Design a protein with these regions (language model features):
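Alpha-helical transmembrane bundles and membrane-interface segments of multipass inner-membrane proteins
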Residues: 1-180
């Protein structure tokens, strides 16, 4: 197993520690929120690092193409669900984001059944970056950054929808060739 794939697996393994830390004392401990944020930031940076290493050293694998975006989904969605629990994000936002992830995962499964691996799109990458930045600020829950956080959240939701449309349009052949 190569280094980028190990970083992807590390990101997934960090999720339970992140969740436990963020939800400690129902999110009332600012110290634990900072620790949770640091875990989230480190996990997010492994996403950036694994992709750069894979491309630079020609270590791109089908496992990485499939697992890297899945690890991102798991990290971001677990954070968003925790933020619902803490009363910091409307449930409808998380429903939109998670619905998009299920739809894209469905596309990937159909493609995989046909021997096709679909890599993440640029819109999907932008979406992930904005979701991660939004989560980082929401975890800190700083009143001074409330407007910036709200703006980032709106951009993240818009990019979620745009990336879904882009993905469906670019990969509609998967549905027609997949017998749907």
């Amino acid at each position: 197993m190569n280094l980028p794939n190990k970083l992807t697996i590390l990101r997934v393994c960090m999720i339970p520690f992140f969740v436990m830390t963020l939800l400690f004392d129902h999110g009332n401990s600012q110290f634990m929120r900072v620790i949770a944020d640091l875990i989230f930031i480190f996990a997010s940076l492994t996403d950036l690092l694994d992709g750069k290493i894979a491309r630079k050293y020609n270590l791109v694998t089908n496992f990485g193409k499939f697992m890297d975006p899945l690890a991102d989904k798991l990290l971001v969605c677990s954070a968003l669900i925790c933020l619902i629990e803490l009363g910091q994000i409307p449930a409808w936002v998380v429903i939109v984001i998670i619905s998009r992830e299920f739809i894209i995962s469905g596309f990937r499964l159909v493609a995989s059944d046909n021997g096709v691996v679909i890599a993440a799109s640029y819109w999907g990458k932008f979406k992930t970056v904005f979701q991660m930045l939004t989560v980082i600020l929401m975890i800190l829950n700083l009143p001074a950054l409330a407007m910036v956080t709200s703006l980032l959240l709106m951009i993240a939701v818009a990019l979620t929808i745009i990336s879904l449309v882009d993905y469906v349009v670019k990969n509609r052949r998967v549905l027609t060739e997949g017998g749907m």
